[in-house]
From Swiss-Prot:
It comes from Synechococcus elongatus (strain ATCC 33912 / PCC 7942 / FACHB-805). This is High light-inducible protein HliA. Its main location: membrane. The chain crosses the membrane at residues 47-67. It is a single-pass membrane protein. The gene is hliA. One of its GO terms (biological process) is photosynthesis. Keywords: Membrane, Photosynthesis, Photosystem II, Pigment, Stress response, Thylakoid, Transmembrane, Transmembrane helix.
Length: 72
């Protein structure tokens, strides 16, 4: 990160003018936001959505009413 002092046109110090350097995760990184993680997240979301639809078809009602009926 750069150091130094930045002032505006009125001579006031601007503490937020220096921004940190942006680092992009490499494609082979094992963590962080990258294409492989985003694809996995999307695929798992699709699997969960299909599982929810199949559960509703099998039970004949939504998942929340089914869980609520089991608790009472």
């Amino acid at each position: 990160m750069r150091s130094g002092r930045t002032v505006d046109e009125f001579g006031r110090q601007n503490n937020f003018a220096i921004e940190p350097q942006v680092v992009v995760a490499e494609a082979d990184a094992s963590w962080g936001f990258h294409d492989r993680a985003e694809k996995l997240n999307g695929r798992l979301a699709m699997i969960g959505f299909v599982a929810l639809i199949l559960t509703e078809v099998a039970l004949g009602q939504g998942l929340l009413p089914f869980l609520a009926s089991g608790l009472s």
